[in-house]
Amino acid sequence: METVKIGDVDLCYEVFGEKNTQSIVLISGLGSQMIRWDIHFCNLLVEKGFKVICFDNRDSGSTVFNTKKEIPSDKGIEEVFAALSKEGIPYSLMDMANDVIGLLNHLKIEKAHIAGRSMGGIIAQLLGSYYPERVLSLTIIMSTSLNPALPKPDPEIMAMMTQPAADPSVDREGYFRAKIHFAEKISGSGYVFDLNQETTLLEEELTRSRTKNGIIRQLLAMGSFQYTPDMLKKITAPALIIHGTDDLIFHADCGKDIADSVSGSELMIMEGMGHSIPRELNDFISDKIYDLVK
């Protein structure tokens, strides 16, 4: 893994399949680190001829958003959220999209295929709309346009997402218990929840994390996003939309909304898939991406 300075961000990234000529950027979701893109999935894309670029979004994992305004560690998410909102939004989703462009510029990549999951799918939409000359194709997984008319997230899940997390340095067991419970809750009914995989990822995320509660600034970026249907209508790149029937964060109608708004896009509704990508779908999704671009 390497780090590059892009504006006020020290961005951590990793490239797989350096010698391949077709580049694909994988964009993670809210509070999610690049290691959530399963290494087997990355290797499958490499085998299909892709140079795979993974990175941590600002305020996630080993990527640091350099700011003098620290996030208080002794207050709940809602309290901090309210305080930061009054001071102004630290950055926008468009700033996060510009981080991707900065990374492509650093790597001297003129055009790339883009795949984003959850919030990363919104960033992918922004790239497809505002940087069409840089985007060869879009794969948008379990995401949303943030159209206010769409169904809201499950209330129980929203409560779990916004309640303060236990400090793992003080209550490691409580931290893991809550995180695992949440991950299992959103995983969907069609696939067996892999407890060992989730535990391993959580342990690695703790080791890699550089910013405590950085997710709050990402939430502010999402909360300040102004939906406009014109953004999706401007997308001209080939687009694949993948969404699960069991998604409790972004209802399946969110995926349908994107597909209805992006001309010529393909929609795949996956039975039993929740708001995560089970390993059982790695082959299928990598095949669909290859079919999209070949």
Where are these regions (language model features)?
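Conserved acidic catalytic loop of the alpha/beta-hydrolase fold
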Residues: 82, 90, 94-112
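Conserved hydrolase catalytic core segment
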Residues: 110-150
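Short beta-strand/loop motif that positions the catalytic acidic residue
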Residues: 235, 241-243
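Flexible "cap/lid" loop of the alpha/beta hydrolase fold
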Residues: 138-169
